[in-house]
Amino acid sequence: MIFHTFLLKYGEIGLKGKNRYMFEDALVRQVRHALKDVDGKFDVHKSQARIYVDCEGDYDYEETVEHLQKVFGLVGICPVVRLEDKGFEELKKDIVAYMDEMYPDKNITFKVESRRAKKSYPKNSMEINCDLGEAILDAFPEIRVNVHKPDVLLNVEVRNEIYVYSQVIPGAGGMPIGTADKAMLLLSGGIDSPVAGYMIAKRGVCIDATYYHA
């Protein structure tokens, strides 16, 4: 399956208060910076506590994910299928098609987990979970439900559009670089100083490194 959108999740930033937008904006800038050397055209934007990367035309999937995994502040990178809201019956067909293409081996367990950010949607999260799960079971009787430890956790986020994903690639975590103070790092020649630099950069500190040649 070819993905043209990534949904990016952040962690600690979500705990911020009225200044959360500053951290989100910094993270968007870092994502754009990380993708500037990747072949392809990317539109990075934020909406409703999520950051999205829309990939226009051809791009290198593996290279894109590799660069995103290095961005401090991201805890999850989700390749998503973005769907227009054409009604629930169409959504069920799209979900069945997604499961069929993503998981040719149907000897799996699954769970549907939905998030209804669009409160005007006619079904609540529990109804979405049950009805989509029923559609999958009707289409593939060999698939089983496991709500505790499923092989596949199928996420459905209902917003202005509908986002479907079942992969969450781990991110670097931490805070975006530039959201804390600056610091100087003395590179002594051992392994401890670059490790310390990595750990403090992960807290959002912008580092300038110094090395004395003797």
Tell where the protein language model's regions lie, with residue ranges:
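RNA-binding accessory domains that recognize and position tRNA/RNA substrates
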Residues: 1-184, 194-214
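Conserved G/P- and acidic residue-centered "switch" motifs that form tight phosphate/ATP-binding loops
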Residues: 190
